[in-house]
Amino acid sequence: MALHDENVVWHSHPVTVQQREQHHGHRGVVLWFTGLSGSGKSTVAGALEEALHKLGVSTYLLDGDNVRHGLCSDLGFSDADRKENIRRVGEVANLMVEAGLVVLTAFISPHRAERQMVRERVGEGRFIEVFVDTPLAICEARDPKGLYKKARAGELRNFTGIDSVYEAPESAEINLNGEQLVTNLVQQLLDLLRQNDIIRS
């Protein structure tokens, strides 16, 4: 569909974002986890979702591998496909924020421009960039999926950190040391959410 198609009209919802947030008892927001493969993005995001669920917070976790089984199953790993992957995820995340959810996304999302694109789509105050800062050597030593080994052997092309660039955030809302205990990282994130009045419990 062309963006300029005049036959496609936006319909406003009778229930507002603010009403949905009041119903949930917290604000809608995206926590955008970014970092190298093996940095701990999915692990920390999953642990945070579990902690938030126990607090009664309405959440949803969008994982990089999972969306490629459905929503983005037609995309590869070229720069163009990666950009489209992030665009689609950003649109879904934005819809979930408008539903009043705390959305956690775990994607390498290697380019600053794509992360900024999602930030602008979601809106300031509703986008929290979480940089899981783990050295490449540590990520490669972990190699939970065996992808670094394949990349080093030339069996996997365009792999971020090896033969494809990762642009680290320059001004993320929070930088997490990926070598710390997951429980410590989750606590840092809960503190941030409370400080920003996103959750109250």
Swiss-Prot record:
Alphabetized InterPro entries for the sequence: APS_kinase, P-loop_NTPase
Gene from which the chain derives: cysC
Catalytic activity annotation: adenosine 5'-phosphosulfate + ATP = 3'-phosphoadenylyl sulfate + ADP + H(+)
Name used for this protein in its record: Adenylyl-sulfate kinase
Residues bound to ATP: G35, L36, S37, G38, S39, G40, K41, S42
GO biological process, one term: sulfate assimilation
Positions annotated as active site in the UniProt record: S109 (phosphoserine intermediate)
Taxonomic lineage of the native organism: Bacteria, Pseudomonadati, Pseudomonadota, Gammaproteobacteria, Enterobacterales
Highest taxon of source: Bacteria
Keywords from the UniProt entry: ATP-binding, Kinase, Nucleotide-binding, Phosphoprotein, Transferase
Enzyme Commission number, as recorded: 2.7.1.25
Pfam families: APS_kinase
